[in-house]
């Protein structure tokens, strides 16, 4: 798997919309995956023998325009979630500096551990609303998929989930790559 044609950060400025008001959502089963209230990590692990997190990059960055309420630097982590060595999801997480020092969470020491395991195993992180986005076949996400040898014939979809910890908020964006969408349709994975 090579992603050398692009470099960290891979993310792009995205127009997110509220899932509750979303029109023209994709058909099932992708729609159910986008709106699933629980841990995407757990859902993905149920679809494979080997689940793996491949880190594309992480570090302090200024958020993209419109990506975070404050334009202060945040910790950005970008990974691929792979099922049986095939990338299914590109994930981009934004963590405010104030949360990096939280005792309950060792964000900087996650390594290849899935972030979802940490967030859904602690009551101090409360899952919030889900927003949805679609990506054209010319988007940076599509370019990333193509660099992973995944053909992009149709628009791609992703979701952004808010997580609250005390007065702080972090965002986890999960974009479904073509291999995931094809497998969901083929296996009828809801």
Swiss-Prot record:
Substrate binds at residues 77, 115, 174. Pathway: Cofactor biosynthesis; ubiquinone biosynthesis. GO terms for biological process: pyruvate biosynthetic process; ubiquinone biosynthetic process. It is an enzyme of class 4 (lyase). Keywords: Cytoplasm, Lyase, Pyruvate, Ubiquinone biosynthesis. This is Probable chorismate pyruvate-lyase. Its EC number is 4.1.3.40. GO terms for molecular function: chorismate lyase activity. It catalyses: chorismate = 4-hydroxybenzoate + pyruvate. It is found in: Cytoplasm. Gene3D superfamilies: Chorismate lyase-like (3.40.1410.10). GO terms for cellular component: cytosol. It comes from the Bacteria. Belongs to the UbiC family. Removes the pyruvyl group from chorismate, with concomitant aromatization of the ring, to provide 4-hydroxybenzoate (4HB) for the ubiquinone pathway.
